[in-house]
Swiss-Prot record:
Ranges annotated as biased composition (Polar residues): 392-408
Keyword Signal: yes
One GO CC term on file: extracellular space
Gene (UniProt): PI16
Region feature O-glycosylated at one site, mapped onto this chain: 386-395
Phylogenetic lineage: Eukaryota, Metazoa, Chordata, Craniata, Vertebrata
Miscellaneous information on this protein: May serve as a marker following prostatectomy for prostate cancer.
Protein name, UniProt field: Peptidase inhibitor 16
InterPro entries in the record: Allrgn_V5/Tpx1_CS (IPR018244), CAP_dom (IPR014044), CAP_sf (IPR035940), CRISP-related (IPR001283)
Quaternary structure, from the entry: Interacts with PSP94/MSMB.
Tissues in which the protein is found: Expressed in prostate, testis, ovary and intestine. Concentrates in prostate cancer patient's sera.
Length: 463
């Protein structure tokens, strides 16, 4: 009996772990947060034409908490109480959030946007794209939540993603950024890094600062000239690839904590006159050469960037498309993937959207609105579609938003994208749905699996 109790005590943590790991997922992981910021900055650095005033974007926990709180409400529509915050929405009926897919959905709208005229093609959405590349926006915070029922959408079991931005973008009549040489118009107090304007003294700069390293017990002395010992062993560090060392010449070396440099692939080592070391256990170098680490970070403008792999095929598409996806690694947004079938939705503005657009047109010019609410009647400008779709394409009208069931059969995962806007500027919010083959409400099977496994495990412990 004692053995059975011990066995059950061992099984209990395993059962709790099983239920915890297979339950509904809804919060963004640290990796997904990092990926969201990285993809925003990659897209911002690679805009064409190049931007002269594009700010580096960073994560903001307050915005993330605000976005998460709204995501918990499970509403497919923009937050009316978001104040002076920009907002992008994305939803997917699949097992967890797909950050690269969400970013590509938003960024693909660039082919409908005319930068010179600051207009969007009639019937298209550009608000996601313009918010992503809005030069003055430099803070982002996102939150996701699993919704068994998303208000405004007939589909069930949906993962909703909300991203908020500060300062907000999508100002009526204004371009997202100024064309020109990258970083040529950075604000005062900013410097250029990877074609983006980054604040001087930001946390990202910490790894670029040199550190004084006088203790290196893990390295062997390979050369010593005119060095003196004063009670402690001394050595000449001839190669320290993991550290950055400032010049120490003819001065006493004091003990300092070694600083680890995460990116220092190359270094130039020079010899300096020997320096005296006072007593400092366990080991103090008496001659420390100056090592200048030359960072060789790849430029975002020199070659195409391959984005992190996704469990889906992130085929960039307009915000009112339906595209099948399979389990294939993600590729660069500049490459198209075939052979997919896309259904292009209706291009007409919905009646309620037209009424809102007319009402918004009466506001002062300084009001911030979504660019695509007022589509231009002239032809699309210089930004052309760079992606080739080789699948069979047919047209199909959406009966009315937010009913998305008419755009695809409920046979797999779907993604919904709602354009970015500011309060009072909601436009033709037509969702896009992405169908998949091996998706589904995986959150249902987790608890059931735990319940099915519980009786056999208990019986095994008793007998």
């Amino acid at each position: 009996m004692h053995g059975s109790c011990s066995f059950l005590m061992l099984l209990l943590p395993l059962l709790l772990l099983l239920v915890a790991t297979t339950g509904p997922v809804g919060a963004l992981t640290d990796e997904e947060k990092r990926l969201m910021v990285e993809l925003h900055n990659l897209y911002r650095a690679q805009v064409s034409p190049t931007a002269s005033d594009m700010l580096h974007m960073r994560w903001d926990e307050e915005l993330a908490a605000f976005a998460k709180a709204y995501a918990r409400q499970c509403v497919w529509g923009h937050n009316k109480e978001r104040g002076r915050r920009g907002e992008n929405l994305f939803a997917i009926t699949d097992e967890g959030m797909d950050v690269p897919l969400a970013m590509e959905e938003w960024h693909h709208e660039r082919e409908h946007y005319n930068l010179s005229a600051a207009t969007c093609s009639p019937g298209q959405m550009c608000g996601h794209y313009t918010q992503v590349v809005w030069a003055k926006t430099e803070r982002i915070g996102c939150g996701s939540h699993f919704c068994e029922k998303l208000q405004g959408v007939e589909e069930t079991n949906i993962e909703l993603l909300v991203c908020n931005y500060e300062p907000p973008g999508n100002v009526k009549g204004k371009r997202p950024y100024q064309e020109g040489t990258p970083c040529s118009q950075c604000p005062s107090g900013y410097h250029c890094k990877n074609s983006l304007c980054e604040p001087i003294g930001s946390p990202e700069d910490a790894q670029d600062l040199p550190y004084l390293v006088t203790e290196a017990p893990s390295f062997r002395a390979t050369e010593a000239s005119d060095s003196r010992k004063m009670g402690t062993p001394s050595s000449l560090a001839t190669g320290i690839p993991a550290f950055l060392v400032t010049e120490v010449s003819g001065s006493l070396a004091t003990k300092a904590l070694p600083a680890v440099e995460t990116q220092a692939p190359t270094s130039l080592a020079t010899k300096d006159p020997p320096s005296m070391a006072t007593e400092a256990p366990p080991c103090v170098t008496t001659e420390v050469p100056s090592i200048l680490a030359a960072h060789s970070l790849p430029s975002l403008d020199e070659e195409p960037v391959t984005f992190p792999k996704s469990t889906h095929v992130p085929i960039p598409k307009s915000a009112d498309k339906v595209t099948d996806k399979t389990k294939v690694p993600s590729r660069s947004p500049e490459n198209s993937l075939d052979p997919k079938m896309s259904l292009t939705g209706a291009r007409e503005l919905l009646p309620h959207a037209q009424e809102e657009a007319e009402a918004e047109a009466e506001l002062p010019p300084s009001s911030e609105v979504l660019a695509s609410v007022f589509p231009a009647q002239d032809k699309p400008g210089e930004l052309q579609a760079t992606l080739d779709h080789t699948g069979h394409t047919s047209s199909k009208s959406l009966p009315n938003f937010p009913n998305t069931s008419a755009t695809a059969n409920a046979t797999g995962g779907r993604a919904l994208a709602l354009q970015s806007s500011l309060p009072g500027a909601e436009g033709p919010d037509k969702p896009s749905v992405v169908s998949g083959l091996n998706s589904g409400p995986g959150h249902v099977w987790g608890p059931l699996l735990g319940l099915l496994l519980l009786p056999p495990l208990v019986l095994a412990g008793i007998f």
